[in-house]
């Protein structure tokens, strides 16, 4: 994310980060559709994990060979400090304009932003709430398909049906990130709120459906919503801070995304086993809170670049 932010204008950043997020979506489309081909002897069910490790090595090599050198597009240049005159007292902060403006100087030391920084705190909270909601529904959708379709005694059919539902959801996510965000030129706040609304509707439909078509349709709508939400939250946090702070906020966003998958899936499955509707009530309540609270809290400072 910091690499992309250092090479894009402020107006382009939402689209650029959407494309970055969609690269993860490609994997969620290809993965469920091809995973069963990697079940081969002698590894068996561990086959996909072995292939995942091999792909990781291949990506590492490709990055080393193909990724351009880490030289930001917006380099620091200009005077270290303004000349002491009356005009400089009233001049705007050099970072209030884009990074290629005269006098844009980056700090020599590494930037460490507090988690409670008011510029980005609301975006990180939104990411934490929406990320947990998505992690929960991803954790239970396979069990939901198995239970609602009565596939307890047919595990291979359950795997195929669950994989197909997840494939449909992943394609909906890509539709949002490759189609809707660039076509509609959605701003970060609009992307988060619209995504949360669609995710809420999709979650409700998934929770009340008892056949494959209803579940897959509901999950597709929810995935479409989360596909809008994630790039919006990422872009919002990025746009809230200055260019030289992008590395720190990128690390915080990565932490937020990872934190959602530590406890949330286990909590979702536990609630699902206790009482199926409880899981979807929790997800829906979280998204409803995000929509109501986000309309007031998600704002961008005008001076960030």
Regions picked out by a protein language model, each given a short descriptive name:
Residues 190-204:
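Structural signature of the two symmetry-related core transmembrane helices
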Residues 70-124:
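Juxtamembrane intracellular "pre-TM" segments in multi-pass secondary transporters
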Residues 151-170:
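Loop-to-transmembrane helix entry
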Residues 1-8, 228-241:
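Intracellular juxtamembrane helix-capping segments at the cytosolic ends
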């Amino acid at each position: 994310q910091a690499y992309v932010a250092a090479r894009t204008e402020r107006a382009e950043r939402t689209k650029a980060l959407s494309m970055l997020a969609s690269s993860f979506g490609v994997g969620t489309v290809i993965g469920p559709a091809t995973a069963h081909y990697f079940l081969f002897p002698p590894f068996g069910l561990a086959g996909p994990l072995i292939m995942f490790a091999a792909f990781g090595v291949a990506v590492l090599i490709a990055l080393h060979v193909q990724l351009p050198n880490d030289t930001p597009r917006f380099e620091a240049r200009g005077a270290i400090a303004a000349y002491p005159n009356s005009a400089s007292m009233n001049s705007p902060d050099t970072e209030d304009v884009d990074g290629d403006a005269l006098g844009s100087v980056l700090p020599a030391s590494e930037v460490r932003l507090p988690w409670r920084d008011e510029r980005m705190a609301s975006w990180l909270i939104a990411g934490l709430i929406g990320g947990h909601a998505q992690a929960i529904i991803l954790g239970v959708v396979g069990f939901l398909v198995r239970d609602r379709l009565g596939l307890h005694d047919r595990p291979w059919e359950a795997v195929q049906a669950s994989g197909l539902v997840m494939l449909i959801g992943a394609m909906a996510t890509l539709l949002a990130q490759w189609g809707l965000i660039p076509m509609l030129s959605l701003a970060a706040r609009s992307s988060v709120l619209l995504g949360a609304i669609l995710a809420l509707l999709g979650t409700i439909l998934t929770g009340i459906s008892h056949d494959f078509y209803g579940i897959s349709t509901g999950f597709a709508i929810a995935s479409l919503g989360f596909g809008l939400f994630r790039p919006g939250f990422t872009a919002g946090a990025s746009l809230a801070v200055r260019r030289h702070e992008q590395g720190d906020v990128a690390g915080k966003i990565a932490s937020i995304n990872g934190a959602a998958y530590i406890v949330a899936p286990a909590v979702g499955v536990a609630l699902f086993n206790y009482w199926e509707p409880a899981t979807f009530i929790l997800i829906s309540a979280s998204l409803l809170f995000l929509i109501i609270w986000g309309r007031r809290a998600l704002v961008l400072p005008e001076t960030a670049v």
